[in-house]
Amino acid sequence: MVRYDPQGVKIVLTAPRGEMSRYNGDPFGAFIAVFPEKVIPRVILRPEWFKPEDNPDGSARFVPYGLRKVEALLRRHFAEEDVVVCHPDNLERFVGPKTKVVGITSMDPMGLAYVSVTYSSIIAVPGDSVDGLEFRRVVENPALRKYDPLVILGGAGAWQVRHAGKVEAYGIDVLVHGEGELTVLDVFKKAVAGEPLPKEVHGSKVPIEFISPIVNAASYGVVEITRGCGRGCQFCSPTNRRRHSLPLPHILKEVETNIRAGSDSIFFATEDLFLYECGPKFEPNGPAMARLIEAVGSVPGVKFIHLSHIAIAPVAYDPKAVEMISPLLMEKTRYTPSFRSNYTEPFVTALFGIESGSIRIMKKYMRGKIWPFPIEQYHEVNVQGTGILNDNGWKPMATMITGWPDETPDDTVKSLELIDKLKGHDVFLVPLLFIPLEDAKLKNERRVSIEQLTPEQWDFFAEAWRFNIDVWAQELQPLFTFASLFSYFTYFRWKHGRKAFRPIMKIANFPVIGGMPEKFPPGAPASVNPRYCAEDEAMVARTVETMSIPVEMEGPQERPIEVLQRR
């Protein structure tokens, strides 16, 4: 137990309550905090989720992984008693006259991330998201106003505060963007010494030897296994980061740190599990992934292993790699009938990005998305890959985006066609609006507003949620029908007009009323399940084994490269 100065700790690190919570051990429960605070019932947003989990000395037991990375950097230079990471409810305990700087991290402080913008626009209820409200509570904390320490804001959402014009209003002195290993320590040293500071600091690509393991536990037992991506998607920021696989001893050290603090789960932070020790041309390394999962799973105290993201192309390219790791992951899955009564069987889950069904959009903005397959095979690879995951006990989630720059109605219809092809598969679709993120290549593009959505784009949202209800919650259809009809006639009719009528009728399960004449007719037969279609399987197999085409990549591999040929 550390003895902290009652007159204030020199450096205090914290985050909003919604980002500190572990949501009963379910990482995907955190999505609740992106919705408008006014529409989240208190029975769902349980008060106990936001209560502090403290160590005996008052420091936080579990905090976001990025904050632990900053703590590890600061511990290189500052004494242990000079740095504390605390729950925001405890700021008045640690911020005092001797406090020099308060560091805050936030993923979505102004509600400008993909999910929050999309669904706050559709729900159309004014006010902050839960994350936004909790962030404001941090920066308006009485202790910060009373003692006026320097405030440094980092995290993936730091850009949002500048974008919203709230930097001065929220009393923020420095914004830190990007990877911090080469910049953060210097900023805090200058802040403590009272030296002049820049208003904004941008991190640079970090060599692997500069990545320090965390020294205290992260929420959900997060450990970083890879960093960066390299596929070159222009709407995404991680693709601009140098791709690394962290060494197994480094990973195991972080696992042990989490378990020692009382976590019973480990969460693999990665842009794609299949990047772990992959080949130079993205070849998945099944044996290396199996060794990783076995090593982590064998650490005493590890009951569960969670995954963040995967890519679908490696699944279709090397199904045997999926077969190799799936039994190991199934042994450590939290998603079982004992965790949720509506789960009929255990399953593994992770998030991958479909993004669009339009080959034109994919070629323009995400040409390397399914490399080594040619982008023309995009539908087949996504459907086949999803089927392979299902066959190995996975029930993944997949994001799909509409509102791309220069998206046409035909592009949107192509996404609708891909949704139709996925029928018969277990996947949870997350339909979103395009958002120009600050550190992505498309940052200067304009995002579409809810008022500008075309009928096809409204139908895109309706089809995705109709798909989800059919796959995941058929028994709740009467509830969805009542809620859809009630919300339309009492609210959405006045908020969005008649353009919301057909989509809501589709969710209400009135397909004849909810269909889209001409473009996407109601009652069209579901596509043949390509998982069992020999022609589609042969198409993918031929691509893997024989095709060799140039693909222009963005990011670290900017030269043209060729599709892999299986020998």
Model-derived regions, located:
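Radical SAM enzyme core and accessory elements
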Residues: M1-V43, E456-R567
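N-terminal pre-triad scaffold of radical SAM enzymes
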Residues: D5-G18, K205-T239, L252, E256-R260, ...
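Conserved SAM/AdoMet-binding glycine-rich loop
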Residues: L13, T257-P396, T402-W404
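A solvent-exposed, charged loop/short amphipathic helix patch at secondary-structure junctions
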Residues: P27-D57, P109-R136, K364-I375, T454-R466
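Short, charged N-terminal beta->alpha structural module
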Residues: E48-H77
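Glycine-rich beta-alpha loop elements in corrinoid/cobalamin-binding modules
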Residues: G66, V84-I211
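Flexible glycine/acidic-rich beta-alpha junction loops that bind and position SAM and/or redox cofactors
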Residues: V102, M110-Y114, F267-K281, A316, ...
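Catalytic cores of alpha/beta
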Residues: R162-Y170, M324-I325, P405-K421
